[in-house]
Amino acid sequence: VGLINGPRGKGRIEVIEPDVLRLSFRWDRPPAPLEPLILLLGLPRPQTARDLLREATTLGATALHFVTAERCDANYAASSLWSTGEWRRHCLQGAEQAFDTRIPEVSWSHSLESALASLPGGEIRVGLDNYEAPGALGACEEIRKRGEQPVVMALGPERGWGERDRTLLRREGFLLAHLGPRVLRAETAMVAAVSILRALRGQM
């Protein structure tokens, strides 16, 4: 058993009666803090967002900010995925898969520009882009050199970043990088990018 964003432990059923179920718990130490990894995700279709919520939580992202960008459909932010709180269930599934209790901070109501303006500062900033990136993410020495600094990774919407988005990312100090010549689904690109990031840091 586990408490959301708290310790794990073992539960034991002590009493079962027609109107009573009594449990006892023995808690382990709280898990170690996650390495800060903020994902800025161009707001996708709800089904893609569900996959991103689950997989990013499994991979240990600490914050997921779904942002409107030049090539996004802003109506996706009105989906019942967000308005009913369904998104939380997908995060919980991702945490369960990782045998963890922690779920990330999640937002879906900001523009790319406002999300960039709210970043704390001092992070390694990487934007994935298939068209204007000068090199591959796996060859990004900046990540390797800067060790354990927090990372902000920006992944475009399903139609990619627009020119205005790229200008904003560059202005805010993002290094543009690509994942190779093939065009990937958003959820596949996210898993590949986080895996490459972990490998660059010697974590896998």
Where are these regions (language model features)?
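A C-terminal functional module that forms or caps the active site or interfaces directly
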Residues: 148-168
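Structured adenosyl-cofactor binding patch, chiefly the S-adenosyl-L-methionine
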Residues: 163-204
